[in-house]
């Protein structure tokens, strides 16, 4: 539902004797709803299992790994899936995804990927396994930096008068920070600032384009070492009301902060935000909220 809760009446009506799999998407995607907490996912799983004990519950865990103490498999999910070029790859994994869960679920997925009987025992490793393991080792620290950046962005833009989801002091269940600008110019300018702060292709200016699968143009900013890695500093959003940007990532807290400040610089240069607004917001944010300490306390 729009408020991030589950439509239990709809779930009850939807699960029938033919239902084999129920999927839950943890993160918000391009929806304005809040991200779903692991506790809320656990309650939904218990509800589904009460209706059909044999139904398989699969959770799309993208952007949520290492944000909370528990993962969906700790609260009853049969399997979780995600991307290695997001949180769990630590910015080092160049490709790949993961499937974690009960043995039979993982085996069935592997058989579907390759062939029955062979499963995950075959396939090229592409000589990237060391990057997978090293990225996984660094992933909690990298995710912590991304969380700090999201909290900083939320507090700063909230003080500037923009609607942010989640708010600066709200609990965090993934690394994504949404900021609603109300105009396409604000959304585009923010993405330009993020791109200009990138370690790769910082000379490029992102522009909206007709991306397949979307009902509006989409703009994306990501000067990343790994193509498509949204655990690196990145931002994107559809060019339609409320003109919200979805900001995430930053391999270090310092780079995330730099990208956010760069986005403000572009907004000032285009006259969308005044320098006095920013000075006032910075003073208020630094006085009332220390996003670094808050994020550290949440994680550690």
Question: What do the predicted segments below correspond to?
Answer:
Residues 158-291:
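Conserved C-terminal alpha-helix-loop-beta "cap" of PLP-dependent enzymes
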